[in-house]
Amino acid sequence: MRSKKMTHGLEKAPHRSLLHALGLTREELARPLVGVVNAANEVVPGHIHLDDIAEAVKAGVRAAGGTPLEFPAIAVCDGLAMNHEGMRFSLPSRELIADSIEIMATAHPFDALVFIPNCDKSVPGMLMAMLRLDVPSVMVSGGPMLAGATLAGRADLITVFEGVGRVQRGDMTEAELDELVEGACPGCGSCAGMFTANSMNCLAETIGLALPGNGTTPAVTAARIRLAKHAGMKVMEMLERNIRPRDIVTEKAVANAVAVDMALGCSTNTVLHLPAVFAEAGLDLTLDIFDKVSRKTPNLCKLSPAGHHHIQDLHAAGGIPAVMAELDSIGLIDRSAMTVTGRTVGENLDALGAKVRDADVIRSVDAPYSPQGGIAILKGSLAPGGAVVKQSAVAPEMMVREAVARVFDSEEAACEAIMGGRIKAGDAIVIRYEGPKGGPGMREMLTPTSAIAGMGLGADVALITDGRFSGGTRGAAIGHVSPEAAEGGPIGLVQEGDRIRIDIPARALDLLVDEDELARRRAVFVPVEKEITSPLLRRYARMVSSAATGARQR
């Protein structure tokens, strides 16, 4: 066992002395030592309850004959970090989470690990660490928040974001917004729609690194506590059988994850996170693979923000196993992929009797919302390296559109124009210098997209950026434009009034300016250089790769 490096042998007597100082007995040190990585904090609603999950995990580890040892991980709430300087630090936290766990689990060689994340970057960060360390591991997340119940009906955080635009437009009073503010987020859990956190938690289950039910079991239920106990017990089985994360994360898992991603209509942030996660296992997930899978995978779900259903509805309809079973019926799931249950995907689906219980929430493959998946990859003269759009959340009128460029070099400048009523139907808002390097940090553009939707412009205005979007964004929001402006990409050459053509079915994004004019602009182009006062962000800007490859740190 790995832990013998610090518990066994004459020369490890000082190590044992330190471990006894923790209150551990000889009997406890004789058992496998299981690290429990807990991202609990009192800042993030999705993490406020994770101590309860950790206690359940530790109970499961002890029940199966192990000794649990808990240590912390950081987590950022993207909602609280939105639309200010803090959002620059969200994506960089992904690698920081992975690195810090690698440090802790190598300095203190545990025999196995249980990972407890919940919100946006904590899930991919922990998955990256899990694959990097490759010791027997299980992930169990904190679970989704329930949707809010308000006088106007069901609500979630995105309802509040869009409410700001509705007040600005005059469709909602500030008193009505206040009522929404207090009711939209009723308690603990990751925000209730198919936003980034829930997208990644569902995909962790799909990949096989979390138990069935991990992605959709509500945070406030006893079933979530039982799931955590089972995770603690299951990691001991993984240790006994020496099943490691890289035994599970193979090309088969990649194919399953991308197919389910497309069927669910997950966040576009999965196009950043999945390549970064799979790279830790030596696997290359490209934009072309995403698009190839999207073209043949039906979109079976329209969860908030694309529709009115929430994660609790997906859970009641059969959850991720039901979605996988539906895709399996047309050969889009590899049933032979291994999982942390110790069984294959196919064996899990059979044992669970996986089936769709509500065909309104999970459509049949014979009657999907769309014959193609939720995400599309666009390329063209404006994005030769690629761009990403959640096509399942785009209004039909915006699938093919020629628009007039309104150019802004920051999110703040664009928001000021939107809120000031200076954006009109037929415009394409271009926000640049918000990419991984140019931001730096690749901020989410949820505030401007929510303002567009709230002001009733969602079917008339596009937003194009080298930044990224929240999983809660809807509309013609095209992000991850590569190369980014700071790297000399064509988005840096766009001028006010240029015409841009969007053709999502044809996967095209083009700047309608002739090549001679672009050459003249390129000859005098000088990228905007921002003053970066944060040492962390300076390092990040130097080390980060393109969004087209997952914005990984080199």
Swiss-Prot record:
Catalytic activity: (2R)-2,3-dihydroxy-3-methylbutanoate = 3-methyl-2-oxobutanoate + H2O; (2R,3R)-2,3-dihydroxy-3-methylpentanoate = (S)-3-methyl-2-oxopentanoate + H2O
Named cofactor requirement(s): [2Fe-2S] cluster; Mg(2+)
HAMAP family the UniProt entry points to: IlvD
PANTHER family reported in the protein's UniProt record: D-XYLONATE DEHYDRATASE, D-XYLONATE DEHYDRATASE YAGF-RELATED
Subunit structure: Homodimer.
UniProt organism field: Nitratidesulfovibrio vulgaris (strain DP4)
Co-factor note (free text): Binds 1 [2Fe-2S] cluster per subunit. This cluster acts as a Lewis acid cofactor.
Active site: 470
GN (gene name): ilvD
Protein name: Dihydroxy-acid dehydratase
Pfam families on file: ILV_EDD_C, ILVD_EDD_N
Domain of life the protein comes from: Bacteria
Xref: InterPro entries: Dihydro-acid_dehy_C (IPR042096), DihydroxyA_deHydtase (IPR004404), DiOHA_6PGluconate_deHydtase_CS (IPR020558), ILV_EDD_C (IPR056740), ILV_EDD_N (IPR000581), IlvD/EDD_N (IPR037237)
Pathway(s) it belongs to: Amino-acid biosynthesis; L-isoleucine biosynthesis; L-isoleucine from 2-oxobutanoate: step 3/4; Amino-acid biosynthesis; L-valine biosynthesis; L-valine from pyruvate: step 3/4
GO cellular component: cytosol
Family: Belongs to the IlvD/Edd family.
Enzyme category, top tier: lyase
NCBIfam families according to UniProt: ilvD (TIGR00110), PRK00911.1 (NF002068)
Chain residues that bind Mg(2+): 78, 120-121, 444
Keywords in alphabetical order: 2Fe-2S, Amino-acid biosynthesis, Branched-chain amino acid biosynthesis, Iron, Iron-sulfur, Lyase, Magnesium, Metal-binding
Gene Ontology process terms (BP): isoleucine biosynthetic process; L-valine biosynthetic process
Chain positions recorded as [2Fe-2S] cluster binding sites: 119, 191
Task performed by this protein: Functions in the biosynthesis of branched-chain amino acids. Catalyzes the dehydration of (2R,3R)-2,3-dihydroxy-3-methylpentanoate (2,3-dihydroxy-3-methylvalerate) into 2-oxo-3-methylpentanoate (2-oxo-3-methylvalerate) and of (2R)-2,3-dihydroxy-3-methylbutanoate (2,3-dihydroxyisovalerate) into 2-oxo-3-methylbutanoate (2-oxoisovalerate), the penultimate precursor to L-isoleucine and L-valine, respectively.
Residues that bear N6-carboxylysine: 121
Assigned EC number: 4.2.1.9
GO molecular function: 2 iron, 2 sulfur cluster binding; dihydroxy-acid dehydratase activity; magnesium ion binding
